[in-house]
Amino acid sequence: MIITEILGNRAQLSADEIAQYTEEKVKLPNLDLVKRIQRVTTDADREIGLRLPSEVKELKDGDILYQNDSLLITVEVLPTDVLVYRPRNTLEMGKVAHSLGNRHLQAQFFGEDSEYGETVMVLQYDHTVEDHLKHVDAQYSREDRVMPEAFRHAEHSH
């Protein structure tokens, strides 16, 4: 089976609608979310190929890859090892963000209305970043999180 489009997201379906299907999940780590062409296996050992158009920038948790009268195949994003930085104030955040930005690291930002309940910067785990956060006495925690967007390798040139 070759999948060439995303049909929607399971978040758009009610629990009653989902219950009408046998659901198989394709469990993907962060790095695989940005691969448009890949071979994957569902949790029921069904092998499928993905050949997604360039308009699809990344897969999201709950994306529907296949749907018929009885079967639903969806994406389940695996938790990512991340550092959640909780700035004490704007000055500290600016200094830390500037230092980490010089390393061309991808970061995701969340506000008080997010699941974090406060303003945070989330970075994919890296021991050198953790060392830096310790060195500047930043408030942070290391967590496993399902991220709403994939972390991408940052391309750059000077």
UniProtKB/Swiss-Prot annotation:
Give GO cellular component annotations, separated by semicolons: cytoplasm
What NCBIfam families does the entry give?
A: PRK13261.2-3 (NF009757)
Where is the signal peptide, in residue numbers? none
Q: Which family does it belong to?
A: Belongs to the UreE family.
Q: Per UniProt, which keywords does this protein have?
A: Chaperone, Cytoplasm, Nickel
Q: Which gene encodes it?
A: ureE
A Gene Ontology molecular-function term? nickel cation binding
Q: What is this protein called?
A: Urease accessory protein UreE
* Main function: Involved in urease metallocenter assembly. Binds nickel. Probably functions as a nickel donor during metallocenter assembly.
Coiled-coil stretches noted in the UniProt entry, renumbered to this chain:
none
Keyword Chaperone on entry: yes
* GO biological processes: protein folding; protein-containing complex assembly; urea metabolic process
Is GTP-binding included in the keywords of this UniProt record? no
Give the subcellular location. Answer: Cytoplasm
Q: List, alphabetically, the InterPro entries matched.
A: UreE, UreE_C_dom, UreE_N, UreE_N_sf
Tell me which domain of life the UniProt entry assigns to the organism this sequence originates from. Answer: Bacteria
